[in-house]
């Protein structure tokens, strides 16, 4: 949580303004240098605050905590620089390196040295430092730093973009944390375990969507000033809606067929909540697509306040209903809060960009969702197999403009590799 204040979300501004100036080297240098000054000043000030607090109240592992904050801040900065420059291969490789090195360090410290909780901080700090060093080497980061390139107007411009993203990030954190705190307080840790189990499945969907969303935020920022941007954004929003509604419903049906293997009989009560949370996470992903458009438009204020409103709604609904409907309050409040964010963001985007969801597809999607809903709660394997087959045929047909070119592209790539 402290990381949001340490960085002021300036790394997101680096991505947005570097991608906008890919062909303007001097502007890139000025933005990166100016942003690095903001980061170093904030990280330095945060270090002094930590030292001051530690002198009054001892902070456990204070050196590791400070190192981890610096490491994460620096890594986030250069990783967003890589995205802004279009170095997506390096971005993916670095993400892999950070994940693997964190895992290896944790295993060595926990298994080999029995270090316990401290291993998490060590792994966090050093894995991010490794990723940072990789980016510095691959991107030649020093070429983007020039002492005389600091520009106060560019700093102001970037902060206007990044500061509204702080309440946005904090609100997401509060929304995710408040559910669990409210559940523990009113219902107990056993129910929190059930809710945690129910949330495991939506993370599968989130992992798939994140890959798409990373590419989307880049492409929409590149296209935002094009003459045909409305046509492009509308097309991509509709394609994203079609593809991920299909993926989401596919996961729902697969869960109904394999719940006891995936989650286990001891968490049987999680079954009903998974459906609600999967629908909620789909709406959340559509919020992210709209957030990408707003980011491209540099309207981060809307991103910030819509998330704050959603987080408040989530907490209020949860508090109001948890004593009457129990754990369902958490899953329903999550769904409703995401829907609120989606509605507000859609209205904001439609004021600037033409977006129209296909009415015909929406009717078909709702009809298919009702069928999936019936099969999910009826819980007969043979029926859900039939539904899965029907859903697959329907989904492939609806997404043929995406899937068939993708398949042909993969075939051509494989053919080229064979010839080489």
What are the residue ranges of the model-derived segments?
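Membrane-interface junctions at transmembrane-helix termini in multi-pass inner-membrane proteins
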Residues: 17-22, 71-95, 278-309, 349-353
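Alpha-helical transmembrane segments of multi-pass membrane transport and lipid-handling proteins
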Residues: 4-6, 33-59, 63-64, 234-284, ...
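Hydrophobic alpha-helical transmembrane segments
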Residues: 93-141, 309-313, 327-348, 388-391
């Amino acid at each position: 949580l402290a990381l949001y204040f340490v960085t002021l979300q300036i790394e997101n501004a680096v991505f947005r303004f570097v991608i906008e100036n890919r062909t303007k080297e001097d502007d890139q240098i000025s933005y990166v240098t100016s942003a690095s000054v903001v980061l170093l000043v904030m990280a330095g000030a945060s270090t002094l605050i930590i030292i001051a607090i530690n002198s009054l109240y001892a902070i456990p592992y204070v050196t590791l905590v400070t190192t981890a904050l610096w490491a994460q801040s620096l890594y986030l900065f250069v990783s967003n620089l890589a995205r802004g420059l279009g170095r997506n291969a390096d971005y993916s490789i670095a993400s892999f390196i950070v994940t693997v090195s964190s895992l290896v360090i944790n295993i060595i410290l926990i298994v080999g040295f029995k270090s316990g909780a401290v291993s998490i901080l060590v792994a966090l700090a050093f894995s991010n430092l490794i990723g940072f060093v990789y980016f510095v080497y691959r991107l030649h980061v020093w070429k983007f730093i020039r002492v005389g390139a600091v520009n106060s107007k560019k700093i102001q411009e970037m902060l206007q973009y990044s500061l509204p993203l702080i309440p946005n990030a904090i609100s997401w954190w509060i929304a995710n944390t408040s559910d669990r705190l409210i559940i523990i307080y009113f219902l107990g840790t056993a129910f929190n375990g059930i809710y945690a189990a129910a949330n495991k499945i939506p993370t599968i969907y989130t992992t798939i969507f994140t890959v798409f969303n990373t590419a989307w935020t880049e492409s929409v920022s590149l296209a935002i000033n094009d003459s045909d941007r409305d046509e492009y954004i509308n097309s991509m929003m509709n394609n994203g809606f079609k593809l991920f509604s299909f993926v989401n419903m596919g996961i729902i049906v697969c869960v109904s067929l394999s719940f006891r293997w995936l989650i286990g009989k001891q968490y049987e009560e999680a079954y009903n909540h998974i459906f609600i949370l999967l629908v909620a996470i789909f709406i959340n992903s559509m919020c992210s697509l709209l957030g990408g458009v707003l980011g491209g438009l540099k309207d981060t204020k809307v991103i910030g306040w819509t998330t704050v409103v959603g987080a408040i709604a989530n907490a209020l609904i949860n508090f109001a209903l948890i004593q009457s409907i129990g754990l369902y309050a958490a899953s329903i409040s999550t769904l409703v809060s995401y829907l609120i964010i989606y509605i507000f963001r859609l209205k904001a985007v439609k004021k600037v960009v033409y977006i129209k969801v296909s009415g015909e597809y929406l009717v078909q999607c709702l009809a298919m969702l009702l069928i999936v809903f019936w099969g999910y709660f009826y819980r007969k394997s043979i029926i859900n197999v039939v539904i899965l087959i029907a859903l697959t045929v329907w989904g492939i047909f609806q997404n043929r403009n995406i899937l068939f070119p993708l398949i042909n592209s993969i075939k051509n790539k494989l053919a080229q590799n064979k010839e080489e």
